Amino acid sequence: MEIVSKSYLSIYGVISTYILNEALTRCNANVSFHIPDRIKEGYGINESIIRKAAEDNVDIIITCDNGISAIDQIRLAKELGLKVIVTDHHDIPFIEKEDGSREYIIPKGDCVVNPKRKDCNYPFKSLCGAGVAFKFIEELYREFNIPESEAIELLQYVAIAVVCDVVDLVDENRIMLKKGLELINNTNNIGLRALFKATGLEGKTINVYSLGFVIGPSINASGRLEQAIWALKLLMEENKELAEELADKLHELNKDRQELTKEGLEKAIEIIESNNMDKDKVLVVYLEDVHESIAGIIAGRIRERYNLPAIVLQRHMMELRDQGVP
């Protein structure tokens, strides 16, 4: 049986994909994965991915940290004979009726795992995407009679997503983070240890700050400026030298991302202040050459500086507008 795990392009999508890949492989499944190219494929599952999976005789698609809004895409997958399992934590899409009531829409997958479903009795609703994937893995391991301790080991990765997804650190999120930090400080993962070395954390205690401001951004930089597959390969790498090469590459990418963000923000501030835009109710700034993957970061920094809603546009976005894309 061929299974493809399909990830949301982010650090939490990378983590979800990694732990699902490890777990499914442990259950003797034939697993491959797909993390989209941010520029070419955008976010989430799309028609081309589904058709390619069908052409490759894939049996099951499992989404990681996405899929709850992919109504049409999952319908297509079912029409093509694929089974679909959705693991997601995002809000359930809905249609608001004239009377103000809401009709919630769930994709017609074979299994849709999301604690925010209105018909879900799971008591904790604020899991991150990797947390939802972990809960799926726990149940999977029970079905395959795999020791619970093996699932618990995966919390060292879930902890990264808990911090970087900025979910509330309460209830299960806090429990997962606490246990994950214990595990990650004694990790045997060659890729993580290489990243600790590359970022100057080797021999130091890994804490919430380390995850949120050093490890997380380094993993995420590959998705922002290159391809998130690099981060996933790092976590899967078993050769120390190759892992260190990948870790160094990710660390350098993150430094590049920081510098590009700094330059973009400085340019945006110059535009705003030279045009007296700080009196506007909404700040809309066009930065022609800024990398589209950091436009959102710059917009956030502008919002923080001026305490106003901010939108940053760049060349690719304007090209889409000119082509009729809203």
Summary of predicted features, one role per range:
Residues 54-126, 130, 134-143, 153, ...:
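Active-site cavity-forming subdomains of large catalytic enzyme subunits
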